[in-house]
Amino acid sequence: MNNTFLLLGNQLFDPQILKDRGCKRVFMAEDYGLCTYEKHHKLKIYLYLCAMREYKDELQRNGIQVDYFSLDDRLDKKTYIEFFIEFSREQKIDKINIFEIENKFFEKKVLSSLEKAGIEYEISETPMFLFSRKEFGSLYGKNKSFRLGNFYKVGRKKFNILVDGEGNPLGDRWSFDEENRKKIPAKTHIPELPKFNLSKYHDAVASIVEKLFSEHPGNAENVWFPVTRSEALDLLDDFLIQRFENFGAYEDAML
């Protein structure tokens, strides 16, 4: 079994998912193209880079070898896939595992490049979504269009959300859209966001962002979000405990 995986910057999954698939080694590379295909805010680029570096450490703590390349390692401006193919040839890797890539254009480019380079690949189903590609595709049937309202019905039945034992909606309602457009009252208490420690990579990444992406909007000073998986899960817990109860009524409101 081939046990080397190519992981993109948005595929920072629970390491156990990789271990369950026999993963022993991972290739990760920061990519200039990812940071510049749009003129992203500097904090978004900061999140990309810090999260990837923190995830590298998490994989290593789980006994997975990581071949990691920062932007400083890639100043020759090769594309992401060109860089990976060069790495594979140097390491004599002739087969790679990848997860489905949600960007279909980029996925097609990656797969065709691997084929041209003579590198075999095995594709694993992504754990990123609630519906698999096959399952989602089957929802369309012969219809040329598929409305969100129909998708919600399927999802509620699949996950048993507000339905009875026969799959009928509780209260005879499939939609509650008209109830999520309330204005937030002026005296409503909105809990403060939890505080997170800066990443150990903060200084290095903030410096890279300012040096390489100086023309992008914003700055990398006001970091208010987590950059590790564990702290992101903590933030989710905080949302469910502190905010979820009233989220539905005000989800379309702006402050």
What is the role of each PLM region?
Residues 47-50, 54, 105, 227, ...:
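Generic recognition of stable, solvent-exposed alpha-helical segments in well-folded globular domains
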